[in-house]
Amino acid sequence: LQLKDAKELLGDDYGNLYLYKNKDLSFTKYDSVGNQLGQLMLTFPYKIQSVNNPLNIVMFSENAQEIKFIDQNMNEIQKINLSSHFGFIKAVYAEDLQFAWMIDESNKTLIQYNFRSTSKISSFPFNINLTSLKDFLVYNNRVYILRENTFEVYSTKSALLYSAPISNSKKLRRINNDIWIFGSQTIDKFDGKDLSKIFEKKKKKIV
């Protein structure tokens, strides 16, 4: 695999690999031995939510204000234009194959959205500073925010419950009840109370 300029490298439950490059906005699928299975050329930058289920890959573009759904052949199967329903959506967390959480920056709200029926399930006032926001997720009525140099936990009412400095952070993932924070060379784990480092390789790069 050509990992130069790779923004993200992801793997699904069937051993396939997905490479997203910000430089040319390409999203490419490979099998386990590196054979290319498909490629999608995008017009805007997108954040890949998850590829665990390769039949339905969810991706979000802040620039385009839309959510795309991609099938196993890297074909677009659905697109939702968020600007026709909401204000400016800063970030999206796809909770599963039906629901997503979204932060509406212009209206200062946290929204739970059913993207299958395109209906709003619930919304909460969520007035926090979104400067340098890199990723977020929602689990058990807690909102986990990853910034350039900080990891924060909020209630759905915007109350700050936890904050810790962190460097070179890239993305958040939920593993069972824990929140994992992936950096360029480290992985940290938040167990609901404390943050601990569980992996570090100075000469390696986590994509």
Q: What positions do the PLM features span?
A:
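Repeated scaffold domains used in trafficking and secretory/extracellular systems
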Residues: 3-12, 44-51, 86-95, 129-140, ...
